[in-house]
């Protein structure tokens, strides 16, 4: 009979439980309270598990860091846990980066970016230790977003420059640039490049390093900028590769000529511009490079291969 009363208490609406529970024998009241506490504990564990799963899917952070973040925020808020996790990821990434300083990082990507109006173009090299990590879509997206962020930042800084080439060898300054999406230059992903690289190191356990970067600016209307990268599946992204080139031409009459010339530089790897002009085109062996250029002149060019940064 007592258990029937207990069943009716458990199944009753919450507002009636306190009244009905008084009719239970004392032993059954204790059992009811234990059941209630157990269900609350299960509910809390369930919500924490859901939070851990969601954070893992969104950040790909190590599970032990996610659990720490959830525990420190009592598993109550996704956004609070994510904020704590972000700080933990940065700290772990910086510690790992120090530990991994001596490790060789020659894999990764040469990445290019160009403004929609072709007023400026950027090329950078982002390195990691293994091809496995380089093939991670998050690392590929980091390279693309970094190139776009550097391009827009340096183009604004050098907007009044009369120099055709703007080379930044101060990588520490570049790492202070705020990262934005390569798909939306007005976006703000909330991290500097340094923070983003630290997070990537924390996630992958590998050294993630910006090795070099360069920006070309078109300072005269008759100049044309071009870019080309080679060495990856086009389904990954046409702006990523093992080899890349930026080119600046003057008096270019044909649209897209600078891109074509950049492709030739990548294929030929000439030692000098004189050698290049007298070479036969890789893509049209009936013409020399001088023929392809026509009235255009090569003002500047840079060709990089992955893993060869000094």
From Swiss-Prot:
Residues 1-42 form a transit peptide. One of its GO terms (cellular component) is mitochondrion. One of its GO terms (molecular function) is translation elongation factor activity. It is found in: Mitochondrion. Keywords: Elongation factor, Mitochondrion, Protein biosynthesis, Transit peptide. Pfam families: EF_TS. Its main location: mitochondrion. Associates with the EF-Tu.GDP complex and induces the exchange of GDP to GTP. It remains bound to the aminoacyl-tRNA.EF-Tu.GTP complex up to the GTP hydrolysis stage on the ribosome. PANTHER family: ELONGATION FACTOR TS (PTHR11741), ELONGATION FACTOR TS, MITOCHONDRIAL (PTHR11741:SF0). HAMAP family: EF_Ts. This is Elongation factor Ts, mitochondrial. The gene is tsf1.
């Amino acid at each position: 009979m007592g258990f029937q009363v207990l069943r009716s208490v458990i199944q009753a609406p919450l507002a009636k439980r306190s009244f009905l529970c008084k009719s239970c024998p004392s032993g059954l009241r204790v059992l009811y309270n234990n059941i209630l506490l157990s269900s609350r504990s299960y509910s809390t564990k369930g919500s924490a598990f859901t939070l851990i799963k969601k954070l893992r899917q969104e950040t790909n952070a190590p599970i032990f860091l996610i659990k720490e973040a959830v525990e420190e925020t009592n598993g109550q808020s996704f956004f609070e846990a994510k904020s704590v996790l972000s700080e933990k990821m940065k700290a772990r990434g910086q510690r790992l980066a120090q530990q991994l300083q001596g490790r060789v990082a020659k894999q990764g990507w040469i990445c290019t970016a160009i403004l929609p109006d072709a007023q400026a173009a950027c090329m950078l090299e982002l390195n990691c230790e293994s091809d496995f990590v380089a093939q991670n879509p998050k690392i590929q997206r980091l390279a693309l977003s970094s190139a776009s962020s550097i391009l827009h930042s340096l183009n604004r800084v050098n907007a009044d420059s009369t120099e055709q080439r703007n080379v930044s060898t101060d990588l520490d300054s570049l790492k202070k640039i705020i990262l934005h999406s390569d798909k939306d230059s007005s976006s703000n992903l909330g991290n500097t490049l340094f923070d983003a690289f630290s997070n990537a190191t924390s996630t992958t356990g590998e050294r993630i390093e910006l090795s070099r970067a360069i920006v070309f600016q078109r300072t005269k209307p008759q100049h044309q900028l071009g870019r080309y990268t080679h060495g990856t599946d086009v389904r990954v992204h046409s702006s990523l590769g093992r080899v890349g080139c930026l080119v600046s031409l003057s008096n270019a009459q044909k649209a897209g000529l600078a891109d074509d010339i950049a492709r030739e530089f990548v294929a030929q790897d000439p030692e000098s511009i004189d050698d290049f002009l007298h070479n036969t085109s890789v893509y049209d062996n009936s013409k020399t490079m001088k023929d392809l250029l026509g009235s255009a002149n090569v003002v500047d060019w840079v060709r990089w291969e992955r893993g060869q940064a000094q």
